[in-house]
Amino acid sequence: MLLSDKDIRAEIDAGRVRIDPYDESMVQPSSIDVRLDRYFRVFENHRYPHIDPSVEQADLTRLVEPEGDEPFILHPGEFVLASTYEVISLPDDLASRLEGKSSLGRLGLVTHSTAGFIDPGFSGHVTLELSNLATLPIKLWPGMKIGQLCMFRLSSPAEFPYGSDRYGSRYQGQRGPTASRSFLNFHRTQV
């Protein structure tokens, strides 16, 4: 069941959902807006001949922070990692989806490529996968609204929520945009 504004506020007020910093004006009818942090991970395309998810490629990205109050410029066709300004913490019976903002999508900004789902038990900054599909550069201002979280109540609490030892939750407690850690539990079935 998708939570309404009333339910979202109740979960936050009860301390079951943590959004830090919390701004009540960000609550929408069935979601809560999240803002863009000031850190970005840009890809160093000259470091490797290809991307291989089965091995660690530590130098594949580098951290960039715009100076002062300057925006980050996302060029046409460019893909970068960023993160929410807010730290999000979910209980074991709520999951969430990060969706883009319609107004930004109409400018050509894609907020997440594939990973918009947030498991119950997750705590940390949510990494964003930003792409510019427009033909002009897009200014990304730290602190601007970048997406919205909708929350769903599970039919029962997760037996092994994100962060439990069972799944080796690679991104629990992440700070800022976190590069892929797919190599830590890469799985390939022989076909």
UniProtKB/Swiss-Prot annotation:
What does the record give as its pathway?
A: Pyrimidine metabolism; dUMP biosynthesis; dUMP from dCTP: step 1/1
Q: Which domain of life is it from?
A: Bacteria
> PANTHER family in the record, alphabetically?
DCTP DEAMINASE
Q: Under what name is this protein listed?
A: dCTP deaminase, dUMP-forming
Where, by residue number, does dCTP bind?
Answer: K101, S102, S103, L104, G105, R106, D119, T127, L128, E129, Q148, Y162, Q174
Q: Which reaction does it catalyse?
A: dCTP + 2 H2O = dUMP + NH4(+) + diphosphate
Q: What Gene3D superfamilies does UniProt report for this protein, alphabetically?
A: 2.70.40.10
Q: How does it assemble?
A: Homotrimer.
Q: Which UniProt keywords apply?
A: Hydrolase, Nucleotide metabolism, Nucleotide-binding
Instruction: Spell out the molecular function terms from Gene Ontology.
Output: dCTP deaminase (dUMP-forming) activity; dCTP deaminase activity; nucleotide binding
CDD domains per UniProt: trimeric_dUTPase
Instruction: Provide the GO biological process annotations.
Output: dUMP biosynthetic process; dUTP biosynthetic process; nucleobase-containing small molecule interconversion
This enzyme's EC code(s): 3.5.4.30
Task: Give the family, as the similarity comment puts it.
Answer: Belongs to the dCTP deaminase family.
Annotated active site residues, numbered on this chain, are E129 (proton donor/acceptor)
Kindly list the residues the record flags as site (Important for bifunctional activity).
Answer: G116, F117
What is the main EC category here?
hydrolase
Which Pfam families does the UniProt entry name for this protein? DCD (PF22769)
Q: What does this protein do?
A: Bifunctional enzyme that catalyzes both the deamination of dCTP to dUTP and the hydrolysis of dUTP to dUMP without releasing the toxic dUTP intermediate.
Among NCBIfam families, the record links this protein to: dCTP_deam
